[in-house]
Structures are given as C-alpha cells and as structure tokens.
Amino acid sequence: MARTYLMENYQNYPFLYAKAYATLIQRLSAGDRVIVHCTAGKDRAGTAVAMVLTALGVPRDTVFEDYLLTNQYWDRGGRERPGMDPETVAQIFSAREEYLNAAFSAIEDRCGTVETYLKDVVGLDQTALAALRTACLD
C-alpha cells in the first residue's frame, strides 16, 4: 500500500510542482543560492533536485546516483513506527530507484521527452536552460 501511494505521488510530482520547479530554476539561473528541503528530503525535494540536474544536462544515471545517496546520508534515527510493519516503514523512509523512475516515466509518457516536459510544462526555453547552465556550471 505504501509503495503504491509513493509510486502514484512520484508520477504526479513533475506536474503538481512544475511551477515550483520553474521558480527554483529561475532563482538558480539568477545566481541565487537556494536550499531545497521537505519533511524527509527525498520525495518532493529529491524530485526537484532531479529536475534541476536533468535541466543542467546531467546524465540520467548520475541523477539517480545522486538521489540514492539519500539512503547513505539521511539520519535513520526515529524510523521505528509502532504498529507499522518494517517493510512499510522501509518503503516510506527509503529513496528507491523505482520511485524516481516513476516520475521520469510519467514525464515521458505524457510529454515524450524530458526536454519537451521542461519546455512545455515547466516553461523553460533554450535561453532559460542556457542561463541555468551558465549560472551553475561556469
């Protein structure tokens, strides 16, 4: 049940938060420093960072490697939940490749490519992408 819930959320994140991604990328393009966080730091924040890395041209396998680092660096204290089975707790508190893959699959199913998604849904044209890359990579 938790897995299904998370998979559905990840499929929706790129479309629910497209405006937030646009704002984040605009701020980064302007040279602003930002902090991206949420309760667990892997779902909404992880997807946002994955979209930024993708917009920067980072290879997909590297985007996934970065996302999965959450499992190494996130404080595992306090994960015990009375009344919840350990697998459910693990599903909720783990960054899993299948979750982020659900987001990218939803983008590709609806838009064809991530590039089309960034242009048509997030609103980033080639000029905006170039500004982001200049601000973050130069």
Model-derived segments and spans:
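Ser/Thr-glycine-rich phosphate-binding loops at phosphate-binding pockets of nucleotides
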Residues: 40, 44-45
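Cys-dependent protein tyrosine phosphatase-like superfamily
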Residues: 1-35, 47-138
